[in-house]
Regions:
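Glycine-centered motif in EGF-like
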Residues: 1-84, 88, 107-387
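Core residues of folded domains in eukaryotic genome-function proteins
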Residues: 85-89, 93-97
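Conserved beta-strand elements of beta-rich interaction domains across eukaryotes
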Residues: 94-98, 104-108, 256
Length: 387
């Protein structure tokens, strides 16, 4: 910047980027762009003024540094699905959704503008704001380190750690995806149980570990950053079929500590199967859903064996882990009928046959999306248990 002959200020054009550049965030769902971040507005009202051009250069420099640090971090996140190619960073959120980040001109339009929707614009904007806040926080951390006494001199070159920019975003998106999937599973399962006349319910507390209202001595921005870096945890609890039977589930996603990623834990309270517990830690939501489905099946088998209306045959759980029950005749003591119970996410079936499998005495199927009126589970059991 220098003075012209008339005393006005002149900014050397060679020092100012020819175009404003920004980080563009796009969200894809099933190979279709469903969200794009909005361009960052300049702080100056007049882009042609000296002040406006200086602010443009500052913003472009910030965006270029941000993209450089994003690429630097993305190179160590290959095992988590993050890939870089030329001027593009992309990573999957779920099987259907992925996020793409690139450094583009502010006035550049997307190549897929004709197919774009705006369903996930808010998500794209949130990711863009998050990575900018995290870079600013990293600058603050660098300033703090420079004010501290330097470490002892060493011949080893000190490695500059990658900034935490993508990892907190990855963890949040991954945790949110796992929580939404598990909650949809519970919704289907409990809708199925209620369609069979079972009185039970569940409670979901997504992001139970996040408490931004808690008062601390830190500024609000740092409190937000500390909440982003902390492990994310969501909890679920619910009642089952038999009295006093219940479950608790916890989904935990870690940012910094080991193990990095999402783990599922299930805790069962089943008085009739107190010796059986779920695996300590499961990495996949499908595994946790399969374990919980099996425990619900065990509880339904226990409820059927405890249900003994007057004048009906009593059922005993012969092979509870396979959903099989047998009934005996009160007069002869011989086994008369066999019941096979199967349970899936959207369907529950009870089939009763002779002990030797010679014929089917009755069968009933309940579905989570059924609309027609059907007998309840215990009504069907009582009906097929008549002598």
């Amino acid at each position: 910047m220098r003075r012209a002959d008339d005393g006005s200020l002149i900014l050397d054009k060679g020092l100012v980027p020819s175009k404003t550049r920004r980080i563009r965030v796009r969200v894809k769902m099933n190979d279709k762009v469903t969200g794009t971040s909005n361009p960052v507005k300049s702080a100056s009202s007049d882009d042609e003024s000296i002040e406006g051009r200086i602010l443009q250069a500052r913003d472009t420099l910030f965006e270029e540094e941000l993209f450089y640090e994003l690429v630097r971090e993305a190179r160590i996140l290959g095992p988590y699905g993050v890939s870089t190619r030329q001027n593009l960073i992309r990573f999957p959120v779920s099987e259907e959704q992925e996020v793409m980040l690139d450094l583009a001109d502010a006035d550049q339009e997307s190549d897929e503008a004709t197919d774009e929707s705006h369903e996930h614009d808010v998500l794209a904007d949130s990711i863009g704001h998050s990575i900018r806040i995290l870079l600013t926080f990293s600058h603050r951390q660098n300033l703090y380190r420079r004010t501290q006494p330097p470490p002892p001199l060493s011949q080893r070159r000190r490695h500059t750690p990658e900034y935490l920019l993508l990892r907190p975003v990855l963890v949040y998106l991954q945790h949110n995806s796992h929580v939404r999937w598990f909650e949809s599973f519970l919704k289907d399962m409990y809708r199925l149980l209620k369609s069979a006349g079972v009185d039970c319910d569940y409670t979901a507390t997504p992001f139970a570990s996040v408490d931004l209202q808690h008062k601390t001595r830190f500024p609000k921005v740092e409190t937000l950053i500390h909440a982003i870096f902390a492990p994310l945890e969501s909890t679920f609890s619910g009642t089952l079929v038999t009295p006093k039977s219940s479950f608790k589930a916890r989904i935990r996603t870690n940012v910094l500590g080991h193990p990095f990623g999402t783990n599922h834990e299930i805790f069962m309270n089943m008085p009739h199967h107190s010796d059986i517990q779920a695996p300590a830690r499961m990495g996949l939501g499908h595994e946790a859903a399969a374990v919980l489905t099996h425990f619900i099946m065990l509880d339904v088998v226990s409820a059927i064996s405890l249900h003994r209306p007057q004048g009906c045959l009593a059922w005993e759980a012969a092979y509870p882990h396979h959903g099989e029950l047998l009934t005996t005749s009160p007069t002869t003591g011989g086994q008369k009928k066999k019941m096979k119970f199967t349970l899936a996410r959207n369907e529950m079936t009870v089939q009763v046959s002779g002990i030797r499998g010679t014929g089917v005495d009755g069968s009933q199927t309940w579905k989570s999306d059924q609309t027609s009126q059907q007998p309840s589970l215990m009504e069907f059991v009582a009906d097929v248990s008549k002598e």
